């Protein structure tokens, strides 16, 4: 019988919903219970900002300037933590391009792979995942800022 591995999860928040958006926060939960989260200082040419997206993630641009870390620092830290691993996301169609944008701006190659969470979970498990994630996010938002 094959053992069940704990997946590594990554989530990215961005400045907006379209092609001009860029990552503003990245969070990961590793299979050994290590967690990492960082706000990202926007690069000088990253000027797109969507107020509707801000209402969703509740991160104001001035917060990024105050508490964020430089693009290169965040990308390098992700590479150190995730080298050779596969990370999973429930928002692959947006998280993967945002990570690509981060690493392109940092002038680094990603040392890890990004895969859709749907590749390892059944439809029923995905439903439970979304319900659980929504509950956790509600709790975290109560205490985050």
Question: Across the structure, where does each feature detected by a protein language model lie?
Answer:
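Substrate-recognition/cap helix-loop segment adjacent to the acidic, metal-dependent catalytic center
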Residues: 95-114
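Short, flexible loop segments at boundaries between secondary-structure elements
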Residues: 111-135
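A polyampholytic, Gly/Pro-enriched intrinsically disordered region
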Residues: 59-62, 128-145
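Conserved non-catalytic scaffold segment of RNase H-like nuclease domains
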Residues: 2-97, 101, 137
């Amino acid at each position: 019988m094959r053992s069940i591995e704990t997946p590594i999860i990554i989530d990215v928040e961005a400045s907006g919903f379209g092609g001009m958006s860029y990552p503003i926060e990245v969070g990961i939960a590793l299979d050994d219970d290590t967690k990492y989260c960082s706000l990202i200082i926007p690069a000088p040419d990253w000027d797109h900002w969507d107020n509707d997206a801000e209402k969703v993630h509740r991160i104001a641009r001035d917060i990024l300037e105050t508490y964020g870390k430089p693009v290169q620092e965040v990308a390098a830290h992700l590479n150190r933590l995730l080298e050779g691993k596969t990370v999973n996301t429930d928002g692959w169609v947006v998280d993967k391009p945002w990570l690509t944008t981060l690493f392109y701006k940092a002038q680094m190659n990603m040392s890890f792979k990004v895969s859709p969470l749907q590749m390892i979970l059944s439809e029923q498990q995905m439903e439970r995942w979304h319900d659980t994630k929504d509950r956790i996010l509600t709790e975290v938002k109560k205490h985050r800022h």
